[in-house]
């Protein structure tokens, strides 16, 4: 198709899309018009003013079909708004003012009649229905009106899944809901609230056993109504992962006409609640969650009421009335103690104007110097920069700023970046100190909250946590946010209360210290971070901060509980997550960044407190192999009066814990993104409080002074920021905080000058981001290049242990077994490439030796003197020459000299004949396809023991890292096997199934004491325990039978290998007699079977095996079951003196090696 045709096709598609959108909009308009007409008819039929009464304000009279109309409206809400994700019905009901003109009058009339009838009934003792005719019908109308009010006042929230219709109606409906709230709070002083409470009390007066689910739902509906009234506010409520920066809506744009902020503020809500006894109703419901009401119905709506009632209040202000003064150039001082919200905003604007006026006066010359000024600067290129301004005569920096302002820059193309907002400001007030509340309301709300905490907080939190953990489906993000911020606020409230009130105690919020609580919110924090659900992450950080602050504020009587809780919530995985939060906070909103910095400060303060005596132990993130000695468990159980299983669980838990080291935890925060987050936060220093600035400065001191990571702060943006902070327009000159910044800046510049003298290249480095190349980074830190040719850390080769009757086996049979063990172990660990590299080098050496045979003996002897270096094709193989113990032992068996401290090279020793080299090659190739099999089902690693010269406990918390990053995973096995398919690794499939977790098979180290060594060996050789439920008669037989059986299997495998996997009928018959005779005679032989084992083998691997070494008689038969297993650990000194020693004699083992307990002894 030609190009014009493509253009026409695109234009046609665009036209069709525009037409479809237009048709869809027309359809939506028609749909809304139809719905609006139906709602209008229902609104007319509900009722209206009774004009038959001669009165200026006629009473409201319900229509004949009032109840049916209300039910129809409820059905419309569910049919359209709920099921179709539209707000057409809500918009239509708002335009007809159904709530103000119909629902509120209905509830007020019902409340007045019901109250009067109740008083008369109490006086006369007669039934209330006598004084309130047709009461049940009117009760149903009132109940329907309240249900419809709940639907109309339900908080509107925009999420990523909101439809176009909902976004289009959002701001208009928000204004209508603000009108609803104003009408509810002000109509007859909020008597609608009393009517709603009366509906709930009528149900609560019925005995719990006689209530129905409908009755409990009514109580929940009343709580939802109270929650909606408190939650309606002019702020935009959005829960979105990404929100673009835009011009914020002013307060005038968000508010409807003739409504002020004070009319719907929290102060007005508290006034209405106090007058209509809402606080008493909430305390009644909260304190009777397990008695008078069903917690499954009311616990969550009650928690939401408390959350929205307190989220905009600063808890500290309830106990310490902070009076911020505003200097407006007058003789008197204005404070915010008795100032409305509007007056507060006006005072702030006047204060800013006064400050700017003083700044202008300070930077303007006097009338005697207003005669002009001229400054001309000659550049090295013989050009001149001239400035004519009065400001150049006052300060040098003013002249430079004038020059910069006159520069002509090329217009750069900037991309519009998404700024992640995190938690909406509607969920936590950023102006908590400036919200107006009268002194009477402060007293009322403080008394109510204190009573709630003393009587109901722990009970409500426990029920809410149980409901969260019992539900299978995941909770909504909104519910997670409300749950975490609810705990955060009341924990902070009680912490402040304990400071200002003597009789207050932390016991009343101790429910937050329960395992279920902190496990739940740490789970929400971790999962939300992985899912990039930033609002929930933001709420989790606020809770985590207050949680740690609360724990640190507890006295010595809580020390055990604090230790237990902190050791669980600050696990290694959680510390890693907390360190990653400020890394990703650069692109987030300022409030999100503030939460990150506050959390980081509290975490570091917590760890620093416990680091003084190294008393904080946390759960390790690594899976540790627990080897507990039977004797140690029994001793611990006896000393602590415990049973065996309890003692084992306690000791096992201790194995899973590690001690926190502050320096290694802080190392996780030493990253460039984290530093950038702090610098960006400090750039708005004029808007930050003193405590926030102190926290940022303290973090920089940790980085620059304590950690000596100066390179992170040697950057041009930080230098410019320090200069701006300490300028005349920066921090106030009389501020104590300025003194701290000045001292830090002096030390900073001193270190910078020293570094610049030592490394002139730093002049270039400070202009650009850090380079993460290891060589450059090392040079910038230490001022010298890193030695690239240095010898890596050297580990000792593995030694063989647990090999039965090792001393009596023929040399070549033992060599075959040892090579099989090493090859199978390497295959299991994913080191197939190491075996391949070894075979290539052996084949190269074999070809060289084979080619010299024809040249004569002299040439061959001359060739043997030469050292053939091992050819390592990549860095992994080269590192394995130094640090892989199994591979180093296999090199020795193959005839290589392995690298040592005094001999860093690896080379082939030409002291073997071509036949011997060929034998080694074929043995390795055989075990690649036919892995080693143990008679007792043990893996190949069971027969190996690794040694380390510079041993560090692999389970120690935060092992040292070469790159300086504490939280990087150093599990070598995972790195080498990740993403690798072990196509030829058949050894694993032949063995008993093992754990798929990370291998940590360090069996023993010279630094361990003998008891630990015996415990490890004992547990590693322990046979599985047989349950009594499955004990058969065979378990009572001779234990030697199993050993003889496995020995016969070994001899059969040797025969099969010897004859290439096939035996004749005569050989099978003879071998059957051989096995039967050994079984009958307890392993002893009466006849001669040399004819069976002394035939010439067909495989070249066993071509040189002597006949006398193969003949199996009663004297040479090994006994695998009764001999104790012994091994020897060779020290680094002994190994250095004998680098080529391949085995240790049994006499040396008996002399130097402590005996390991056998299975039967255990």
UniProtKB/Swiss-Prot annotation:
Any one Pfam family match given in the protein's UniProt record, by short name: TIMELESS
Subcellular localization(s) per the UniProt record: Nucleus
Gene Ontology molecular function: DNA binding
Keywords: Cell cycle, DNA damage, DNA repair, DNA replication inhibitor, Meiosis, Nucleus
Stretches for region Disordered: 977-1017, 1127-1162
Gene Ontology terms: cellular component: replication fork protection complex
Chloroplast among keywords: no
Keyword Nucleotide-binding in record: no
Primary location recorded for the protein, binned into one broad class: nucleus
Biased composition (Basic residues): 993-1003
Gene Ontology BP terms: DNA repair; DNA replication checkpoint signaling; meiotic cell cycle; replication fork arrest
Cross-referenced PANTHER family: PROTEIN TIMELESS HOMOLOG (PTHR22940:SF4), TIMEOUT/TIMELESS-2 (PTHR22940)
Subunit composition and interactions: Component of the fork protection complex (FPC) consisting of TOF1 and CSM3.
Family: Belongs to the timeless family.
Function according to Swiss-Prot or TrEMBL: Forms a fork protection complex (FPC) with CSM3 and which is required for chromosome segregation during meiosis and DNA damage repair. FPC coordinates leading and lagging strand synthesis and moves with the replication fork. FPC stabilizes replication forks in a configuration that is recognized by replication checkpoint sensors.
Protein name, per record: Topoisomerase 1-associated factor 1
Gene: TOF1
């Amino acid at each position: 198709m030609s190009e014009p045709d493509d253009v026409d096709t695109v234009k046609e598609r665009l036209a069709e899309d525009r037409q479809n959108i237009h048709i869809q909009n027309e359809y939506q308009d028609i749909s809304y018009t139809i719905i609006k007409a139906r709602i209008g008819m229902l609104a007319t039929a509900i009722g209206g003013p009774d004009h038959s009464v001669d009165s200026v304000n006629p009473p409201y009279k319900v229509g004949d079909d009032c109840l049916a109309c209300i039910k129809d409206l409820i059905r419309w809400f569910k049919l359209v708004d709920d099921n179709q994700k539209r707000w057409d019905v809500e918009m239509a009901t708002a335009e007809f003012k159904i709530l103000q003109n119909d629902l509120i009058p209905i509830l007020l009339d019902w409340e007045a009649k019901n109250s009067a009838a109740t008083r008369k009934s109490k006086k006369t003792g007669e039934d209330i229905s006598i004084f309130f005719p047709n009461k049940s019908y009117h009760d149903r109308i009132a109940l329907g009106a309240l249900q419809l009010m709940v639907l109309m006042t339900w908080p509107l929230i925009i999420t990523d899944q909101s439809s176009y219709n909902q976004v289009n109606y959002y701001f208009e409906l928000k204004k209508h809901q603000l009108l609803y709230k104003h009408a509810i709070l002000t109509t007859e002083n909020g008597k609608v609230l009393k009517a709603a409470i009366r509906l709930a009390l009528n149900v609560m007066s019925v005995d719990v056993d006689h209530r129905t689910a409908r009755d409990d739902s009514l109580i929940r509906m009343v709580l939802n109504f109270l929650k909606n009234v408190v939650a309606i506010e002019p702020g935009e409520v959005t829960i979105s992962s990404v929100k673009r920066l835009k011009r914020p809506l002013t307060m005038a744009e968000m508010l409807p006409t003739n409504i002020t902020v004070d009319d719907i503020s929290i102060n007005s809500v508290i006034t209405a609640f106090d007058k209509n006894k809402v606080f008493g109703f909430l305390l009644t419901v909260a304190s009777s969650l397990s008695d008078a009401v069903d917690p499954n119905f009311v616990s969550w709506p009650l928690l939401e009421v408390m959350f929205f009632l307190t989220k905009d209040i600063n808890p500290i202000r309830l106990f310490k009335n902070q009076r911020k003064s505003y200097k407006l150039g007058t003789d008197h001082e204005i404070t915010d103690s008795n100032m409305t919200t509007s007056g507060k905003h006006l005072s702030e604007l006047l204060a800013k104007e006064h400050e700017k006026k003083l700044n202008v006066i300070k930077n303007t010359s006097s009338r005697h110097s207003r005669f002009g000024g001229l400054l001309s600067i000659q550049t090295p290129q013989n050009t001149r920069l001239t400035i004519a301004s009065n400001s150049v005569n006052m300060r040098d920096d003013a002249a430079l700023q004038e020059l910069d302002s006159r520069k002509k820059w090329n217009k750069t193309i900037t991309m519009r970046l998404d700024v992640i907002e995190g938690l909406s400001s509607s969920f936590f007030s950023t102006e908590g100190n400036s919200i107006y509340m009268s002194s009477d309301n402060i007293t009322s709300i403080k008394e109510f909250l204190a009573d709630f905490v003393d009587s109901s907080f722990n009970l409500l939190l426990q029920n809410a946590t149980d409901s969260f953990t019992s539900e299978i489906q995941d909770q909504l993000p909104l519910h997670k946010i409300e749950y975490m911020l609810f705990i955060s606020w009341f924990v902070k409230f009680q912490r402040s209360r304990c400071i200002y009130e003597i009789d207050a105690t932390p016991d009343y919020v101790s429910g937050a210290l329960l395992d279920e609580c902190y496990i739940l919110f740490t789970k929400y924090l971790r999962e939300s971070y992985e899912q990039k659900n930033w609002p929930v992450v933001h709420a989790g950080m606020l809770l985590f901060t207050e949680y740690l602050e609360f724990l640190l504020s507890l006295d010595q009587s809580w020390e055990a509980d604090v230790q237990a809780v902190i050791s669980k919530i600050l696990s290694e995985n959680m510390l890693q997550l907390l360190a990653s939060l400020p890394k990703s906070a650069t692109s987030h909103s300022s409030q999100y960044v503030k939460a990150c910095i506050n959390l980081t400060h509290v975490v570091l303060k917590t760890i620093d407190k416990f680091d003084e005596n190294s008393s904080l132990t946390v759960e390790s993130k690594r899976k540790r192999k627990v080897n507990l000695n039977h004797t140690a468990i029994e001793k611990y159980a006896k000393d602590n009066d415990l049973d065996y299983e309890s003692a084992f669980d306690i000791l096992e838990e201790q194995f899973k814990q590690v001690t926190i080291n502050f320096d290694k935890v802080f190392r996780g925060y030493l990253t460039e993104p984290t530093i950038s987050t702090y610098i960006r936060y400090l750039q708005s220093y004029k808007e930050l409080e003193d405590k926030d600035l102190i926290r940022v400065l303290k973090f920089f001191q940790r980085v620059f002074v304590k950690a000596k990571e100066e390179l992170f702060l040697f950057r041009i943006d930080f230098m410019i920021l320090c200069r701006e902070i300490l300028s005349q327009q920066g921090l106030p000159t009389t501020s104590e905080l300025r003194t701290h910044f000045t001292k830090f800046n002096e030390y900073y510049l001193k270190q910078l000058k020293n570094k610049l003298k030592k490394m002139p290249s730093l002049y270039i480095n400070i202009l650009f981001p850090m380079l993460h190349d290891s060589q450059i980074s090392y040079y910038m830190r230490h001022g010298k290049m890193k030695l690239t040719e240095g010898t890596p850390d050297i580990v000792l080769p593995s030694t063989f242990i647990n090999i039965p009757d090792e001393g009596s086996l023929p040399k070549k049979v033992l060599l075959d077994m040892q090579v099989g063990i090493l090859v199978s172990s390497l295959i299991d660990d994913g080191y197939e490439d190491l075996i391949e590299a070894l075979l290539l080098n052996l084949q190269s050496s074999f070809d060289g030796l084979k080619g010299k045979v024809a040249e004569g003996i002299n040439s061959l002897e001359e060739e043997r003197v030469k050292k053939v270096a091992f050819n390592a094709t990549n860095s992994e193989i080269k590192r394995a020459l130094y640090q892989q113990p199994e591979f180093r032992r296999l090199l020795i068996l193959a005839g290589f000299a392995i690298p040592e401290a005094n001999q860093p090279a690896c080379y082939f020793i030409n002291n073997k004949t071509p036949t011997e080299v060929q034998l080694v090659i074929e043995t390795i190739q055989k075990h690649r396809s036919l892995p080693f099999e143990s008679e007792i089902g043990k893996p190949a690693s069971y027969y190996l023991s690794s040694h380390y010269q510079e041993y560090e406990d692999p389970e120690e918390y935060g092992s040292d890292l070469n790159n300086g990053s504490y939280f990087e995973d150093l599990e070598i096995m995972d790195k080498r096997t990740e993403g690798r398919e072990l196509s030829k690794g058949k050894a694993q499939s032949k063995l008993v199934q093992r754990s798929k977790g990370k291998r940590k098979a360090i069996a023993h180290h010279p630094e361990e004491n003998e008891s630990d060594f015996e415990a490890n060996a004992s547990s590693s050789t322990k046979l599985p325990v047989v349950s009594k439920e499955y004990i058969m008669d065979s378990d009572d037989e001779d234990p030697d039978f199993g050993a003889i059986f496995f020995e016969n299997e070994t001899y059969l495998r040797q025969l099969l290998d010897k004859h290439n996997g096939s035996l004749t009928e005569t050989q099978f018959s003879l071998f059957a007699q051989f096995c039967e005779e050994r079984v009958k005679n307890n392993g002893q032989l009466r006849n001669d079977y040399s004819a069976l084992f002394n035939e010439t083998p067909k495989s070249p691997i066993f071509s040189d095996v002597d006949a006398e070494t193969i003949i199996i008689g009663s004297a040479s038969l090994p006994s695998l079951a009764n001999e104790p297993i012994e091994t020897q650990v060779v020290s680094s000194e002994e190994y250095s003196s004998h680098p080529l020693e391949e085995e240790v004699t049994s006499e040396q083992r008996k002399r130097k090696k402590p005996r390991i307990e056998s299975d039967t002894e255990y």
